[in-house]
A protein has these predicted regions:
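A surface-exposed beta-strand-loop module
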Residues: 40-42, 68-119
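Extended, low-hydrophobicity, Ser/Thr/Pro/Gly-biased non-transmembrane segments
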Residues: 55, 104-185
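Zn2+-dependent metallopeptidase catalytic core
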Residues: 74, 129, 140-156, 167-174, ...
Length: 462
């Protein structure tokens, strides 16, 4: 049986979108000690008015989290006094301690500045960086945001609740999140240690809210088989409609909390939802903390590995199908052009398009690591379960050296660190045929008796 899995970026390119973080130039501003935001919109969600109050000294200027959102700024005022605006930045140098200002944003223009934005009638989703102005060099350490919306409108955001609003940490100003506004009815599930909220943009979905809830519960249950609980405590998921059937594309964002945007066929069946591998890939990213781009081989590889493993564990596909998908992926990864060390390829993959090699070499690492740990009486599941106690909910971006050093602490001798070093420096695609032979995985995923068949079977078991 020939099994192919397209990588998420292929669906993204087909939709005319682009994967990229929020990028902005640093300036020389200082941050305020505490900032309070109050957000209002009109009923059509065409205009947004934001009041910003500073508990301490204001910064010298405020700007958007996304540079190209600057033209969306309509005006800014302190009371009746107009404030100077230059290239989308608000001059706040004349404000005093404890002052407030108000600015207005054209939401359609802001949405167009936000990558992976989508509007369906009134409902829309985009990055907060397109409408949340802040000090850009040093964002506030403590901030809250409150939404006062017209009747019938809702906001869905991934940030921790505080009173009648949300609490924003610095990552909410430094990284994008998916934030949705509209007339949707949220679907909420609390299970396996996570409070999850899901919203669907627009009308005309063929699958029901009950189908969506079942999909979400199954996904949470499956992902939780790795660490014994869901890897994060709060999660926002946004469904934007697309063509085709099932989940066609997904993206994880971690600005102030974890959010995932999915493009889903509006006319999908419940079975098509359940059988979409993109679900498992994107949610598996949450098993790890945020990591630097040069380690994309590790975090994309681990997500690709678990997308197959978790489907087998949940009965979405058979173990034979999962092994066939992995074997086929290794073959495609090995066909990629070998230019540089894997870590270098990962850092440059959006420029060189070396996605197949980066993803599948990282998947080979995950498989080899899992097998090595299981031979020692542990597993990759167990290593992640222990490591997550350190990074869950914490700030900062990790490097693979630090990550593997943490995971190796429970072993008599380092296992993952040396393997990580070998893979990061490797130019040639890793040899996988011998390992698959020892696991008893043949062509088409056919399984046979082999020295490591017990390890093979345990990987796909719950």
């Amino acid at each position: 049986m020939r099994v192919r899995r397209s990588l998420p970026w292929l669906s993204l390119i087909a939709l005319g979108l682009a994967v990229a973080p929020v990028r902005s130039a640093a300036d020389e501003e200082d941050d305020a000690a505490e900032v309070r935001y109050r957000v209002r919109t009109d009923a059509a969600l065409e205009r947004m008015t934001v009041e910003v109050c500073f508990a301490g000294a204001p910064p010298r200027s405020l700007g958007p989290g996304i540079d190209r959102a600057g033209p969306a700024l309509l005006d800014a005022r302190k009371g009746a006094q107009a404030l100077t605006v230059r290239r989308g930045r608000i001059d706040t140098s004349g404000l005093s301690d404890g002052d407030c200002l108000t600015y207005r944003v054209d939401l359609d223009q802001a949405r167009r500045a936000s990558r992976f934005s989508n509007r369906q009638g009134v409902d829309f989703v985009g990055s907060q960086g397109a409408w949340l102005w802040r000090s850009r060099r040093r964002p506030p350490e403590h901030a809250t945001i409150r939404f006062d919306l017209p009747d019938g409108l809702r906001v869905a955001a991934p940030w921790p609740r505080e009173g009648d609003g949300y609490r924003l940490n610095r990552s909410a100003f430094r990284r994008p999140a998916f934030v949705a506004f509209g007339r949707f009815e949220p679907i909420r599930v609390s299970s396996h240690g996570v409070d999850a909220e899901l919203v669907r943009l627009g009308d005309g979905w063929d699958f029901t809210a009950e189908d969506t809830t079942a999909w979400l519960r199954t996904a949470i249950e499956g992902v939780s088989t790795v660490q014994g609980r869901f890897p994060v405590s709060n999660l926002l998921i946004v469904f934007a409609p697309g063509d085709g059937s099932g989940v066609g594309f997904g993206m994880v964002r971690r600005g102030g909390g974890c959010s995932v945007g999915f493009i889903v066929g509006r006319h999908s069946s419940a079975d098509a939802l359940r059988e979409s591998w993109v679900t498992w890939h994107e949610l598996s990213h949450l098993q790890l903390p945020p990591m630097v781009q040069e380690d994309a081989w590790l975090y994309e590889g681990l997500a690709t590995y678990y997308q197959e493993v978790l489907q087998a564990r949940m009965g979405v596909q058979s173990p034979e199908q999962a092994w066939a998908a992995l074997r086929d992926g290794f073959r495609r990864g090995a066909r990629g052009r070998e230019r540089d060390a894997l870590a270098v390829e990962a850092e440059n993959m959006h420029r060189t398009y070396a996605y197949q090699r980066v993803y599948w070499a990282g998947t080979a690492f995950a498989l080899e690591a899992d097998v090595a740990l299981r031979q020692r009486g542990s597993s990759l599941d167990e290593a992640l379960r222990r490591g997550a106690r350190t990074w869950r909910g914490g700030p900062g971006v990790w490097r693979s050296e630090r990550l593997t050093a943490l995971l190796d602490r429970s072993f008599d001798a380092p296992v993952l660190g040396p393997l990580r070093d070998t893979y990061a420096r490797r130019v040639a695609f890793p040899p996988t045929a011998e390992l698959l032979e020892r696991l008893g995985v043949g062509r088409g995923g056919r399984l046979r008796a082999a020295p490591l068949e017990s390890v093979r079977d345990a990987i796909m078991s719950r």
